[in-house]
Amino acid sequence: MLAGQDKSVNDSAVKVKWGYKGDIVPERWGKLTPAFALCATGKMQSPIDITQKIQIVPHGLSWQYQSAPMIIMDNGDTPLNLDGHQMIINEGHGVQLNFKDSPPREMITFLGNPYRLVEFHFHSPSENRWHGQSFPMEMHFVHQGKAGKVAVIGVFVKAGEANPAIQQIVENLPKVEGRPFTIKGKRINPADLMPHGKAYYHFKGSLTTPPCSEGLQWVVMADAITASPAQIALLRKAMGGDNARAVQPLNHRQISFSAEEN
């Protein structure tokens, strides 16, 4: 965020503040309100540390992303239908890009099911880890499916060459919180923010922010994309610094790995 890290979610018409600093840090989310109880008691929480390939499965991911108008906002809300429950999620991510649902062109197909891209946002440092390794940043692409299904694609971002698609974003960072801005004459294609390799890890998980609802399909791409240190620094500044939840216990979940399609 531009002006700090406090966030809020509607809880019975009461704004419940949560964040990443002070007495409302992730470790305390589950105690802030009963609506956030899963943050403390859930058994399928995200993020996780991807430490092993438990099961190798056939590849089941494809995307049909297309260029779309650039709608960017800071500290915005995301409407989701999760297992039949309509909810408005403020993910505490600071910078997000929204995608309109008509026409539903920004799509993926995962395990035979279609999902529509709702928004993508940034976390820094990365929330998911790979064999204990953290990355400077991670992008989450949030997709809505039928019958209350939600799928999130996580893409690690490492420091390296400047990223032209991310440059579009840093050049148009909003200066006012909570309002979507359509950048006139600018379009963005989410496919430009995906790695060239299509291998991925898959596991069941949750929202990484309150209310930490479970039942999400998580896909984390095996390859990272790059952004320049300057691009990462500008996005971190816009987000107000760190906005990452610590990794959560895997418990009895399986992690599957799918190699790139031939």
Question: Across the structure, where does each feature detected by a protein language model lie?
Answer:
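Alpha-carbonic anhydrase
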Residues: M1-N262
